[in-house]
UniProtKB/Swiss-Prot annotation:
One of its GO terms (biological process) is translation. It holds the Pfam family Ribosomal_S19. Keywords: Ribonucleoprotein, Ribosomal protein, RNA-binding, rRNA-binding. This is Small ribosomal subunit protein uS19. It comes from the Bacteria. GO terms for molecular function: rRNA binding; structural constituent of ribosome. The keyword Flavoprotein does not apply. SUPFAM superfamilies: Ribosomal protein S19. PROSITE patterns: RIBOSOMAL_S19. InterPro entries: Ribosomal_uS19 (IPR002222), Ribosomal_uS19_bac-type (IPR005732), Ribosomal_uS19_CS (IPR020934), Ribosomal_uS19_SF (IPR023575). Belongs to the universal ribosomal protein uS19 family.
């Protein structure tokens, strides 16, 4: 079940404030955030947001196709290093 339409989308206040001030000044720089649950809104298009993956901040350049999705969807949190290889020795 999705979020109620009357509530609107969730965007962290501090993130939205930073985006709006940068838009008013026509300034582009990387914004660090830990808010993976924030929804991408049209004001964010063209900005680079560094989203935390649990270890480091990874840059995400926001495009039109990303609007409506969450920031955390574009930053993987787990690293798959492959399955264990076959044991070369036979069991005796």
């Amino acid at each position: 079940m999705g979020r109620s339409l009357k509530k609107g989308v969730f965007v962290a206040d501090h993130l939205l404030r930073k985006i709006e001030t940068m838009n008013s000044k026509n300034e582009k720089r990387v914004i660090k955030t830990w808010s993976r649950a924030s929804t991408i809104v049209p004001q964010m298009i063209g900005h680079t947001i560094a989203v935390h993956n649990g270890k480091e901040h990874l840059p995400v350049y926001v495009t039109e196709q990303m609007v409506g999705q969450k920031l955390g969807e574009f930053v993987p949190t787990r690293v798959f290093k492959g399955h264990a290889g076959k044991d070369k020795k036979g069991k005796r």
